[in-house]
């Protein structure tokens, strides 16, 4: 398991993994990227299904 930083300078696919750590580190960035995390997770699921 890799450790990601609240998807700050990482790709959207890597930002969908951390969610609890994101809350711990940088709350502003996490809150602003929270939507991106949800989008990322939904896209990753659709990509795996198709």
From Swiss-Prot:
Principal cellular location given in the protein's record: nucleus
Keyword set, alphabetical order: Chromosome, Developmental protein, Differentiation, DNA condensation, DNA-binding, Nucleosome core, Nucleus, Spermatogenesis
Keyword DNA-binding carried by entry: yes
Cellular localization per UniProt: Nucleus; Chromosome
Q: Which Pfam families match?
A: Protamine_P1 (PF00260)
Keyword Nucleus attached? yes
What's one GO BP annotation on this UniProt entry?
chromosome condensation
Q: Its GO CC terms?
A: nucleosome; nucleus
> What GO molecular function annotations does the UniProt record carry, in alphabetical order?
DNA binding
Tissue specificity as recorded in UniProt:
Testis.
Q: Which InterPro entries match?
A: Protamine_P1
Family as reported in the entry's similarity comment? Belongs to the protamine P1 family.
Its biological purpose is as follows: Protamines substitute for histones in the chromatin of sperm during the haploid phase of spermatogenesis. They compact sperm DNA into a highly condensed, stable and inactive complex.
In Swiss-Prot or TrEMBL terms, this protein is called Sperm protamine P1
Which species does the entry assign this protein to? Answer: Trachypithecus phayrei
Q: What is the lineage of its organism?
A: Eukaryota, Metazoa, Chordata, Craniata, Vertebrata
Q: Which gene encodes it?
A: PRM1
